[in-house]
Amino acid sequence: MKPTLPDRSPTSRSVASMREYYSRVLAYIACGASIAAGTYTQYFSYGILWMVPYALLYPHLAYHLGQRFRQHDPRKVTRALLAVDAVHCGLGMALLGFSVVPSLMFLLVLSFTALVIGGLRLLGMALLVSASSALLVAVLVAPPLLGNTPVEVAAVSILFCGLYICITAFFGHQQGLRLAQVRQEIAREQEKAARLARNLAKYLSPQVWEM
């Protein structure tokens, strides 16, 4: 006898999709807050203020578009959305004039997300796409390079990006606890099945087991 193992049901896939959605919303809120703080202090020009509503709207658009294709191949959808996030990261760094603190925070959020999703391989892909898009935008647009980041902008950027990392790490920890609980339940079911098999072996002849 074999115990019934939990499968990747539509419900579990939906939970994973919602977790990815909320994570992306938090990440883009952190980026939008950095841009809003920079424009408020007149560190960034008002010409890039459109990036704030875009950062707030894109995660919802990505979620609804991804849901159409996630049932066929969820891993490809996740990687494709991560690649788009990497393009946005490079685009944001270039349009912000490669401001030190926001650019580093953008890269930190992107790297952390890539490591959580797929390890070093996806991290390398994300950094390569981000660097390529940043270089392309810098060549085409030639934005002015900004100097030291003001304290207000740096504080907002670090605060929101740190909040994103802490919340994501917390949910990852909770997922690990649930996984450990499921493994314990599977182990108990296996032990129960083994005891049942031993008890049946006492009453059934060897010819029955060979059938």
Q: How should these model regions be labeled?
A:
Residues 16, 43-46, 70-77, 122, ...:
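Membrane-interfacial loop-to-transmembrane-helix junctions in polytopic alpha-helical membrane proteins
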Residues 43, 69, 100, 141-145, ...:
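Membrane-interfacial segments
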Residues 62, 89, 165, 169-172, ...:
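Alpha-helical transmembrane segments of polytopic integral membrane proteins
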Residues 74-75, 101-102, 119-125:
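Membrane-helix interface segments
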Residues 118-124, 131, 135-176:
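N-terminal membrane insertion elements
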